From Swiss-Prot:
InterPro entries: Epimerase_deHydtase, Heptose_epim, NAD(P)-bd_dom_sf. Its EC number is 5.1.3.20. NADP(+) binds at residues 11-12, 32-33, 39, 54, 77-81, 94, 145, 172, 180. Substrate binds at N171, R182, H189, F203, G204, S205, N206, R216, Y295. Belongs to the NAD(P)-dependent epimerase/dehydratase family. HldD subfamily. The keyword Isomerase applies. GO terms for molecular function: ADP-glyceromanno-heptose 6-epimerase activity; NADP binding. It comes from the Bacteria. Pathway: Nucleotide-sugar biosynthesis; ADP-L-glycero-beta-D-manno-heptose biosynthesis; ADP-L-glycero-beta-D-manno-heptose from D-glycero-beta-D-manno-heptose 7-phosphate: step 4/4. This is ADP-L-glycero-D-manno-heptose-6-epimerase. GO terms for biological process: ADP-L-glycero-beta-D-manno-heptose biosynthetic process; carbohydrate metabolic process.
Length: 334
């Protein structure tokens, strides 16, 4: 049985391939665009059966000439995830139409389809629950994800021929994101800031939040891969699910975790947030005028629906997850 993973050389896709490998599954077709050639490193430690360029893959899908038999599932992680990309034509073709064509093909062939949505569909809201009235995307990236989620809702009412699951990823961090540049996680940037400068910067106070007190639902990519495989194991489950921890943590906590993990590798003791600030290992910079009124101070996934689907595992909190991530970066990137 063959499994197809799109975006397989990317951040989340390569972690799904790795998680499948850990189960002994290697009959995997990895689909990606390696124009950014350095991404190959994410697959170098994985076992796959074949690599296929994204453009050739979607051509074969649209013409119904893919040569693979007995496809067990498609994990669709291939998309433009740059929220600052305002090219609507590209975003809608790459994120919406490509995904729609894959959905149609999977439904025709009765193949389970698990795809990446995004918490960006919620915009600047304060309640993050999988309900239409709470979804107000602020950019074309969020809109491209929102629009496809709407397609799934309509299809579910009409009746599906095979499983379809959309995951609304919150702030994901972890191994294999180094190719993302400025779009990599805050944990990634804090690690490199500290290694280069000996301190990390956080935004100062704004909009009722104190220094570094803005919060996010930070979720480890290890948990993200684990949940993708949970739904793969339960083909009776379809729908749209938030994929976060259900816990909102301050940027202060993430910065402290990153700095202390680096210090531990240097044989130094753990410091409290107060001590890290006093020693100027965490510094606060003025909140940018350009972001005032546009910056989200809080996100927290409502994971009630995920728990109702039977997922019982605990998530890494920021301290544990970032500590594991820093150890990986020290071994692989430093």
């Amino acid at each position: 049985m063959t499994i197809i993973v799109t975006g397989a050389a990317g951040f989340i896709g390569s972690n799904i391939v790795k998680a499948l490998n850990q189960r002994g599954i290697t009959d995997i077709v990895a689909v990606d665009n390696l124009t950014k050639g350095e991404k190959f490193k994410n697959l170098a430690e994985c076992e796959i059966a074949h690599y296929l360029d994204k453009h050739e893959f979607i051509r074969q899908v649209r013409e119904h000439i893919l040569p693979y038999q007995n496809i067990e599932a498609v994990f669709h992680q291939g998309a433009c995830s740059d929220t600052m990309n305002h090219d609507g034509l590209y975003m809608m073709e790459n994120n919406y139409q490509y995904t729609l064509d894959l959905l149609d093909w999977c439904q025709d062939e009765r193949i389970p389809f698990l795809y990446a949505s995004s918490a960006a569909v919620y915009g600047k809201g304060e309640i993050f629950r999988e309900e239409r009235e709470l979804e107000k995307p602020l950019n074309v990236y969020g809109y491209s994800k929102f629009l496809f989620d709407q397609v799934l809702r309509r299809r579910m009412k009409e009746g599906l021929t095979a499983q379809v699951v959309g995951f609304r990823y919150f702030n994901v961090y972890g191994q294999h994101e180094q190719h993302k540049g400025r779009m990599a996680s805050v944990a990634f940037h804090h690690f490199h800031q500290y290694r280069e400068h000996g301190y990390v910067n956080l935004f100062g106070s704004n909009d009722g939040y104190g220094n570094g007190e803005q919060t996010r639902d930070f979720v480890s990519v290890e948990d993200v891969a684990k949940i993708n495989l949970y739904f793969f194991d339960h083909p009776e489950l379809s729908g749209i699910y938030n994929l976060g921890t259900g816990r909102s943590q301050q940027f202060n906590e993430l910065a402290a975790a990153a700095v202390n993990a680096c210090r531990a590798a240097e044989g130094k003791s753990e410091l409290s947030l107060k001590e890290l600030v006093e020693e100027e290992l965490i510094r606060y910079i003025p909140f940018p005028d350009a972001l005032k009124g546009k910056y989200q101070g809080f996100t927290q996934a409502d994971i009630t629906k995920l728990r109702e689907a039977g997922y019982k595992e605990e998530f890494f909190d920021v301290k544990a997850g970032v500590n594991r991530y820093v150890k990986w970066m020290l071994e692989n990137l430093a």
